[in-house]
Design a protein with these regions (language model features):
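Primarily ABC-family ATPase nucleotide-binding module
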Residues: 1-3
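Short acidic-hydrophobic catalytic motif
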Residues: 217-221
């Protein structure tokens, strides 16, 4: 099986602190890949490098056979743990703006937004400001914006924090459905039960190092 993502010997220093210590990963195409570890282990540092928010001090990242480059922003969907929506902008206006940053035309973005707003039964939110929404409502908008441009690789950092159980299950179902249609998923969490429920591959990150990587059932046997 070919890989959607390869991380090769990535090192990231933050002053005297080593955030990532020569970390290598292989994420198979079409997988749901769990990045498991406690808070502060280095998971978010790695995700920020994959998303080109920060650069590694050494090592490289290969996306779908190509060295990671600025144009790859259009094929990655990233939902950070700290959600980044502008609180005073209207929901619809903001969603259109973020979709166009990912390379979508306004017409395509409007069509996709109509589909997702109807699917999530939130058509009435279009003209609301983000600050008027509950945390769970804002999470739904962030998820829609993350997947709107139909990315090849979906990266979710603690995606269920802030959701009640009903909406968490709704988002889980959508992630699984997107994966069935061919989207590769990296799912970062500190919760083993979430990984066991959704993932077929896993890497355990601890104290800036990768401890283990492989198929979920193989890792559980070790």
């Amino acid at each position: 099986m070919s890989n959607i993502l390869e991380v090769k010997d990535v090192v990231k220093q933050d002053g005297d602190y080593t955030a990532l210590n020569s970390v290598s990963l292989q994420v198979p195409k079409g997988s749901i890949y769990g990045l498991l570890g406690p808070n502060g282990a280095g998971k978010t540092s790695l995700i920020r490098i994959i998303n080109q928010i920060t650069m590694p001090d050494s090592g490289e990242v290969i996306l779908d056979g190509e060295k990671l480059a600025p144009n790859h922003v259009s094929v990655i969907g990233y939902m950070p743990e700290e959600r980044g929506l502008y609180k005073t902008m209207k929901v619809g206006e903001q969603a259109l703006y973020l979709a166009q940053l990912k390379g979508m035309s306004k017409a395509d973005a409007q069509k996709q937004l109509k589909y997702w707003f109807e699917k999530f039964e939130i058509e009435g939110w279009w003209n609301k400001k983000i600050q008027e929404l509950s945390k769970g409502m804002a999470q739904k908008i962030q998820f829609i914006v993350t997947i709107l441009h139909q990315p090849k690789l979906l990266i979710l950092d603690e995606p269920f924090s802030g959701f009640d159980p009903v909406n968490a299950n709704l988002i889980k179902d959508e992630i699984i459905e997107l994966n069935k249609k061919g989207t590769s998923v990296i799912f970062s969490t500190h919760r083993m039960e979430s990984v066991e429920e959704m993932c077929d591959y896993i890497a355990l990150i601890h104290k800036s190092n990768k401890l283990i990587e492989g198929k979920l059932e193989d890792v559980k046997r070790q």
